[in-house]
Amino acid sequence: MNVLHFLILLMSVVSVFCINPEDIGCDDSITPEKFAENDAKCVQCKEQFEETNMLEQCREDCFKGKFFRSCVDHLSGAYDEKDDVEAPPPE
C-alpha cells in the first residue's frame, strides 16, 4: 500500500469517527464499512478538485446526491464534463 492510499484510508477512518451518519441523512441501513468507503471517495474527490465545500456536497443526502455520483464516475474514469452540460432547448 502506498503512502497516498494509506493517508486516504486513515482520513476516512478518522472522518467516520468525526461525522455522525445521521448528520448527513443516513439511517441504520448503511454499514460503518460502506459509510467509510463512500466517505473515502468523497475525500479523494475533494483532494483532486480542492473545492471548499466539495466534501459537504459529496456527503449530501447520505451519498445519494449528484455530487457523489459525479465523484464516483470521475474516480472510475467514467465521468465526462459534457454530461453536466444541459442540452439547449429544441428550436
UniProtKB/Swiss-Prot annotation:
Protein name: Alpha-latrotoxin associated low molecular weight protein SGV150-311
Protein localization: Secreted
Keyword Secreted: yes
Chain's role: May increase the toxicity of alpha-latrotoxin and/or other venom components. Is non-toxic to mice and to the cockroach Periplaneta americana.
UniProt xrefs under InterPro entries: Crust_neurohorm, Crust_neurohorm_sf
Pfam families reported in the protein's UniProt record: Crust_neurohorm
Expression by tissue: Expressed by the venom gland.
Keywords assigned: Secreted, Signal
Leader sequence residues: 1-18
GO cellular component: extracellular region
